[in-house]
A protein has these predicted regions:
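Short beta-strand to alpha-helix junction loop
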Residues: 109-127, 139, 222, 292-301, ...
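Rossmann-like dinucleotide-binding core of oxidoreductases
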Residues: 37-44, 48-49, 54, 58-80, ...
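Beta1-alpha1 glycine-rich phosphate/pyrophosphate-binding loop at the start
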Residues: 45-49, 54-138, 246-247, 310-312, ...
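Short FAD-binding loop at a beta-strand-to-alpha-helix junction that anchors the flavin cofactor
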Residues: 102-105, 201-202, 411-428
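C-terminal, flexible cofactor-proximal segment of oxidoreductases
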Residues: 7-27, 251-254, 263-264, 408, ...
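Short hydrophobic core segments
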Residues: 49-50, 144, 169-182, 219-222, ...
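Feature captures the FAD/FMN-dependent oxidoreductase FAD-binding
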Residues: 112-183, 311, 359
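C-terminal catalytic lobe of FAD-dependent flavoproteins
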Residues: 295, 303-393, 468-531
Length: 531
């Protein structure tokens, strides 16, 4: 199957062969994709996209390319596009996967570093939106509070809070949710005893103060996930010392920030071919290492720990600080570009403490072991709060629907919810790989409905042997805390999630839409046609 996927994709080529690169002019882009221009007062559209981040911009591009007659708008609750890459502003913010796969398939990443910093990624998103005219189809500070579906009208009605707090009503035939999976307003903050006693500053990375001065300060970062391992080395350039306080270790893997093979390909080959080769190299390598780790978890565990030990040098208690209790990919691996965290620890500018917090004190933290950990600044890199669809209330024909009570169809639609798709990327690879496939499949659905005169489509399980599974794809804290809010997966296709790009590509890009599960419907004669 994987070889078949490779042959098909290379035979077909990619849009990159005909699309401009990141540094190409807008004139070349306009020759390939015609930007949709909504009227200023228009509130009724064929498609409404909620969220102007990585996913939403990608969906807009695909609509313009594959469904050029469809009207659409992007409603963004914040004041700027970019989603995650505009929200998080902490030191060192960066990607934790390579930009050749986190970047769009239709627009090559041309930065020298494959592991890119947040501002560069945000520039890439802004440039993409501007280049394809998508920025003209975004309405900022528009928060969708409620979406109500009417089968008799084949229409979604959206209650939206506008820039001035005034309620505005929008409507569409198809609703595409690209609002992420976590609460943008607040991160997860455990309630530790004595927090009010601490005389220093307590900061959550999701609400990073613009002018936080940590020069010469003792900093403690609570957490061991991607945010923590990013913050610690980034802050050592100014801080007196940075300590990462973790309750338990995570798997940490060093990787070069620059991809020498990809950079060589871009130097030697035409850009489209180089983009395809670099992208598929990383896709296949990631799939190989993930599958190998799942088949031989103990071997993968020892390999990862051994590489970390070689980076850290002697004198580090590997069993205590760098040996997790779980297997690789039960939780997402943490990436450190060029081994920056290991270098900071080896140089004595940073340290890892594995313990639990008993209480905050006036001058730092008291740990369960009895140790006192002094701090001037404490950063709580304690994770996210799961919040699907931005907390929007979902109603179908007068019935409130909780996503957690539904099953996920092909990882993008909800059972028995018509004309709604939601982008949710991979947990074991770059988010955009699945986001791109979701956008492509959305366009295939829309075009099929137009060809057949259908008004809406609904994923409906007709197979009694399909059983729901509420187990989240990762055992990470935020996934466990939010598992009841997430749609369940089923025991077999098309309800089962494989977290596998090749399988999803075959299903979403090349597979049939008429799978017996996605039910297409026309408006009844009595309902009449919409004017």
């Amino acid at each position: 199957m994987l070889e078949q996927a490779r042959e098909q994709i290379f035979a077909r080529g990619t849009e990159a062969n005909a699309r401009p690169a990141a540094n190409a002019g807008a004139a070349d882009a306009a020759a390939n994709v015609t930007a949709f221009k909504p009227k200023p007062e228009q509130t009724d559209f064929d498609v409404i996209i909620v969220g102007a981040g990585l996913s939403g911009i990608g969906v807009a591009y695909h609509l313009q390319r594959d469904c050029p007659k469809k009207s659409f708008i992007i409603l963004e609750g914040r004041e700027a596009l970019g989603g995650t890459w505009d929200l998080f502003r902490y030191p060192g913010i960066r990607s934790d996967s390579d930009m050749h796969t986190l970047g769009y398939r239709f627009r090559p990443w041309r930065g020298e570093k494959a592991i890119a910093d947040g501002p560069s990624i945000l520039d890439y998103l802004n440039d993409t939106a501007r280049e394809y005219g998508i920025d003209r189809s975004i309405r900022f500070r528009h928060k969708v509070k409620r979406a109500s579906w009417s089968s008799s009208e084949a229409r979604w009605t959206l209650e939206v809070e506008g820039p001035d707090g005034k309620k505005v009503t929008y409507s569409c035939n198809f609703l595409q949710m690209c609002s992420g999976y976590y609460d943008y307003d607040a991160g997860y903050m455990p309630g530790w005893p004595g927090m009010e006693r601490f005389k220093g500053e307590i900061v959550h990375p999701q609400k990073w103060p613009e002018h936080l001065d940590y020069a010469g300060k003792r900093v403690v970062v609570i957490g061991s996930g991607a945010t923590a391992v990013t913050l610690v080395p980034a802050m050592t350039d100014k801080a007196a010392h940075v300590t990462m306080l973790q309750r338990s270790p995570t798997y940490i893997v060093a990787r070069p920030a620059k991809d020498p093979i990809a950079n060589w390909l871009y130097a030697k080959l035409p850009e489209g071919l180089a983009h395809t080769a670099a992208r598929w190299k990383n896709i296949l390598l990631q799939m190989y290492f993930y599958n190998a780790a799942r088949k031989n978890p103990e071997g993968a565990k020892q390999r990862i720990i051994g590489l970390a030990k070689a980076e850290l040098g002697p004198g580090v208690d590997m069993a205590k600080h760098f040996t997790p209790r779980y297997n690789p990919w039960d939780q997402r691996l943490c990436l450190v570009p060029d081994g920056d965290l290991f270098k900071a620890i080896r140089a004595g500018r940073a340290a890892v403490v594995t313990d639990e917090i008993e209480a905050f004190t006036e001058t730092g933290l008291k740990l369960r072991s009895g140790e006192e950990l002094p701090a001037d600044i404490i950063i709580t890199a304690t994770g996210l709060v799961m919040r699907l669809m931005g907390g929007m209330e979902l109603v179908v024909d007068g019935r409130i629907v909780k996503p957690g009570t539904t099953m996920s169809y092909k990882g993008m639609m909800f059972s028995d919810v018509p004309n709604l798709a939601s982008t949710f990327g991979y947990t074991n690879a770059s988010w955009t790989l699945k986001a791109d496939l979701t956008a492509e499949y959305l366009c295939r659905i829309l075009n099929k409905m137009d060809r057949g005169g259908y008004a809406y489509c609904t994923p409906h399980n007709k197979d009694p042997s399909v059983t729901p599974d509420a187990t989240p794809p990762l055992s990470s804290g935020y996934m466990q805390r939010g598992k009841d809010a997430m749609p369940k997966q089923g025991s077999k296709r098309p309800w089962k999630l494989y977290q596998n790009y090749a399988k999803d590509m075959l299903a979403l890009r090349f597979g049939t839409i008429d799978d017996g599960t996605l039910v297409f419907s026309k408006l009844s004669q009595r309902a009449g046609k919409r004017a």
